[in-house]
Amino acid sequence: MLTYPNIDPVALSLGPLKVHWYGLMYLLAFLCAWGLASYRAKQRDSWTSEMVSDLVFYGALGVVLGGRVGYVLFYEFDKFLANPIWLFQVWTGGMSFHGGFIGVMLAMILWCRKYQKTWFETLDFIAPCVPTGLMFGRIGNFIGAELYGREVQDPNYPFGMIFPTDPFHLVRHPSQIYQAICEGLLLFILLWWFSSKPRPRMAVSALFLMGYGVARFVVEFFREPDADQGFILFGWMTKGQILTVPMLLIGLWMIWYAYQRKVYDWGPLKTHK
């Protein structure tokens, strides 16, 4: 069994201002996405640094607003009805990936109108930059000792740990780290490699949907369901798995359609001498 590091969730205290690790993880996520997108833009003639900066800004708004609204609608709607002001109390925690995903999709529509880019060209461009943000977000969950895993059944399992926020003090899976690795690091490597060569329009976006869908669906088997949600379907499916299934199915259809049409948005990468 591992010992939980029990890191103080407050990273910095500047007088009355307290900076939490979770907020810093979001900042790192956006900075990393901006850096990766800037690198990709230098390899394509039709992208500029201004476009990238705006794209990351629009995406950040979509993530924060969509993530919060999605969490309220998907997981805590009763609390919202009892106290609508709670929606704006973001410091209390509560963000949804699926809500953030929808928020980003809507934000990209506005960005595309501004720069006259097609929606899927834009999504294909930015998709490989997203998993690192997911990784930082899950690390933030781990530091905050939230969204931990289910109880470890094998007494010899070496990676279980007791989270200080667990009222039952059970040895649990560090599912936040599993998600950081699968939804973050591994998905980033896959998408970065796949997008390093010209692919049909929608193919990169499709691979993101499928890759995230598979990773999230599998890791949910190790993650403790929300106490007020439990298992929603068939006695074993969680809300996260249910919301992920449409992403996986849409991704499968998209990659099939992409290779049927074979429309390309860019040619070989630029070389710099």
Curated annotation (Swiss-Prot):
Pathway: Protein modification; lipoprotein biosynthesis (diacylglyceryl transfer). One of its GO terms (cellular component) is plasma membrane. GO terms for biological process: lipoprotein biosynthetic process. This is Phosphatidylglycerol--prolipoprotein diacylglyceryl transferase. The keyword Ligase does not apply. One of its GO terms (molecular function) is phosphatidylglycerol-prolipoprotein diacylglyceryl transferase activity. NCBIfam families: lgt. InterPro entries: Lgt. The gene is lgt. The chain crosses the membrane at residues 19-39, 55-75, 90-110, 125-145, 174-194, 202-222, 230-250. PROSITE patterns: LGT. It is a multi-pass membrane protein.
